[in-house]
Amino acid sequence: MQSGEESRLGIKCASLHEELTQIVIDQDVGPLQRVPASEFLARLVEHMGQTIPREVFGAEAETGTRDLERLGAIVAYIDENFAAQNVLPFTIQRICELCYHPLHYFRVGELRKFVNALEKVCYVRSSWSAGYGAVPSPAEGTPTREASVDVSMSKIPWLPDDGGRDLRQFIEKIESIVSVNFGYEDDEDEGRDAAIQEYYDNEGAGDDEDDDQDYVDEDSATSEDEEEDVEEEEEEEGPEPEVGLEPVHAESAPEECVGTNKRTTAEREDCHMQPCAAAHSTDGAHPCGLKRSKLQEDGATMASPPDIVAEGGSHDPQVVDASKPPQLTTSATNVSCNASIEATVSLDDDSTAGGE
């Protein structure tokens, strides 16, 4: 046969066991309202700080020093903030559940977990008041609501009757407005669907033909653009030269050097155009006397013209007397003029090289 303490789950105080049983098992908060808060908390914290750690969890002073210190701090906090003011913490029901049967939640040797759970529910500031967390009886409270009743249309306990009627009317207005809007949206959807169906039934084929024509127009426009691009490229590159002909490049006009003996192209052409009637004049001067004298004044030297050999009727070479003017043939005249021109050009090149 079990002893009294074992039947009371380790609770030594019989009155505390009855009160905790009524609160935890019967879900009746009557003891919290009848018994002063200071007396109830004094019995509860003694059981919490002394009996539970040593007799329920079997904690020893040497092994569970840290957990016992934390548990003592919890007891001191409850005495100072609630028992001294004769109020209960608003978590008093959860505290009673943990202290009534701690082995229902924790195993033996799990004192640390028990202390952790107490710290979460004891370190609070709000106090418990009458009716807080109480389960009203059907005679005193609102009758049990059926599952089929709409929650949004149920009565709110703290609103007066007039406010409840106004709230019901307001909700009915909202429902009517919402239903009307939904009706308009349905009509718009039906009209849109009908228009789309009619469009595909009547005008679908014509649109396909128009689309095909658009594709053809785009292809033709693309080909014309390509031809224009090719023509522009040909104009930029210019006409191609004919086969077998080399491109002619314009010669840049020679720059006249001031203070030099360089002859210009016009002076050379004048020398070509002068008639060479005789290879030597009567005074022994060069056919191009003016140019020869100009070169002599500038200090340039010129080689004597080549000896002219007169051709007789028998084609025998005869030496021409220097005292008489020689009678030259057409071929001899041409040779003399060409030799003079070559000599003049060589002098011009030498003078240019000396000036540089």
From Swiss-Prot:
<dbReference type="GO" id="GO:0005634">
    <property type="term" value="C:nucleus"/>
</dbReference>
<dbReference type="GO" id="GO:0005737">
    <property type="term" value="C:cytoplasm"/>
</dbReference>
<comment type="similarity">
    <text>Belongs to the PPP4R2 family.</text>
</comment>
<comment type="function">
    <text>Regulatory subunit of the histone H2A phosphatase complex, which dephosphorylates H2AS128ph (gamma-H2A) that has been displaced from sites of DNA lesions in the double-stranded DNA break repair process. Dephosphorylation is necessary for efficient recovery from the DNA damage checkpoint.</text>
</comment>
<protein>
    <recommendedName>
        <fullName>Serine/threonine-protein phosphatase 4 regulatory subunit 2</fullName>
    </recommendedName>
</protein>
<dbReference type="GO" id="GO:0030289">
    <property type="term" value="C:protein phosphatase 4 complex"/>
</dbReference>
<dbReference type="GO" id="GO:0019888">
    <property type="term" value="F:protein phosphatase regulator activity"/>
</dbReference>
<keyword id="KW-0539">Nucleus</keyword>
<feature type="compositionally biased region" description="Polar residues">
    <location>
        <begin position="326"/>
        <end position="335"/>
    </location>
</feature>
<dbReference type="InterPro" id="IPR015267">
    <property type="entry name" value="PPP4R2"/>
</dbReference>
<comment type="subunit">
    <text>Regulatory subunit (R2) of the histone H2A phosphatase complex (HTP-C) consisting of PPH3, PSY2 and PSY4.</text>
</comment>
<feature type="compositionally biased region" description="Acidic residues">
    <location>
        <begin position="202"/>
        <end position="240"/>
    </location>
</feature>
<dbReference type="Pfam" id="PF09184">
    <property type="entry name" value="PPP4R2"/>
</dbReference>
<feature type="region of interest" description="Disordered">
    <location>
        <begin position="202"/>
        <end position="335"/>
    </location>
</feature>
